[in-house]
């Protein structure tokens, strides 16, 4: 699952990206850096710190960034928005890596290759402070299965300099996706020593988060995100899962031209 390791930037602006895009029709460039404390892979009981750069170019409804990839997001007058994105899944390795999720404990499981993906998004800001979003993520390469996510965002505080938001997200995968990340087939069982396991399709994670964005001036801003994730029964009992709940903390600073 791509939300850990190299996809650190996903956690940086995800709660604000859709809302910001809807409010800004100009063109701008943002660069920055962030650091994240997170498990070495989804289900690991070992944590690691990682730093990563951030880049985003946005012109009206078009964008290119390290969070989602390249895409288009259109807002309707009633707060509804639709988007389509071409992005990637970083994959997972069976050794220690700075680029991907992974740990040497997974030796014999093989690598989950980096895959090109497309994401279809629909959301609705029902009020200035409450909105929900759903998306479908499909692989274009490396048939790794489908993902389906539903998210609810609530803005607790918003003024000229600060925004505080809480969110919850339920993540689903079909049988192929869940087995890619949490299943153990015959060959993997022989090579790794893990028992065989079939995860099946359905819910694979639930996230709860609170995040804060602060504007120091017209160009500099900061961000902090604390996220708690729980893994449901179908992936909790996988032999690759050592811990079925974990925290992720992300902090970053950004400069907008």
For each predicted feature, which ranges?
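Cleavable N-terminal export/targeting peptides
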Residues: 1-28, 44
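Short glycine/proline- and aromatic-enriched beta-strand/turn motifs that initiate or cap beta-hairpins
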Residues: 21-72, 81, 176
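Outer-envelope beta-barrel architecture signal
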Residues: 23-29, 49-51, 60-62, 78-82, ...
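Flexible, solvent-exposed coil segments and beta strand-coil junctions
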Residues: 31-36, 63, 98-102, 125-133, ...
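Transmembrane beta-barrel strands of outer-membrane/channel proteins
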Residues: 31-37, 66-68, 84-88, 120, ...
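Surface-exposed strand-loop-strand hairpins of Gram-negative outer-membrane beta-barrel proteins
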Residues: 39-51, 95-114, 199-201, 234-239
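Outer-membrane beta-barrel "beta-signal"
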Residues: 52-54, 152, 244-257
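Outer-membrane beta-barrel transmembrane domain signature
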Residues: 73, 138-141, 145-221, 229-235, ...
């Amino acid at each position: 699952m791509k939300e850990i390791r190299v996809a650190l930037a996903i956690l940086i602006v995800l709660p604000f990206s859709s809302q910001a895009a809807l409010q800004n029709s100009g063109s701008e460039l943002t660069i920055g850096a962030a650091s994240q404390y997170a498990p070495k892979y989804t289900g690991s009981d070992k944590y690691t710190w990682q730093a990563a750069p951030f880049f985003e170019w946005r012109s009206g409804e078009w964008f290119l960034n390290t969070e989602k990839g390249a895409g288009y997001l259109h807002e309707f007058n009633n707060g509804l928005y639709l988007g389509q994105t071409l992005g990637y899944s970083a994959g997972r390795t069976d050794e220690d890596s700075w680029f991907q999720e992974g740990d040497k404990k997974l030796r014999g499981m093989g690598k989950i290759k980096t895959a090109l993906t497309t994401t279809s998004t629909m959301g609705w800001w029902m009020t200035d402070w409450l909105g929900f979003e759903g998306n479908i993520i499909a692989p274009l390469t490396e048939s790794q299965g489908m993902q389906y996510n539903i998210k609810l965002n609530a803005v607790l505080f918003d003024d000229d300099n600060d925004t505080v938001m809480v969110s919850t997200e339920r993540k689903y995968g079909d049988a192929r996706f869940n087995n890619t990340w949490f299943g153990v087939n015959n060959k993997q069982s022989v090579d790794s020593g893990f028992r065989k396991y079939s995860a099946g399709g359905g819910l694979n994670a639930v996230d709860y988060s609170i995040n804060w964005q602060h504007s120091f001036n017209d160009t500099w801003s900061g961000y902090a995100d604390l996220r708690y994730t729980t893994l449901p029964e179908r992936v909790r009992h996988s032999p690759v899962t050592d811990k079925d709940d974990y925290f992720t903390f992300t902090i970053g600073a950004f400069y907008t031209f």
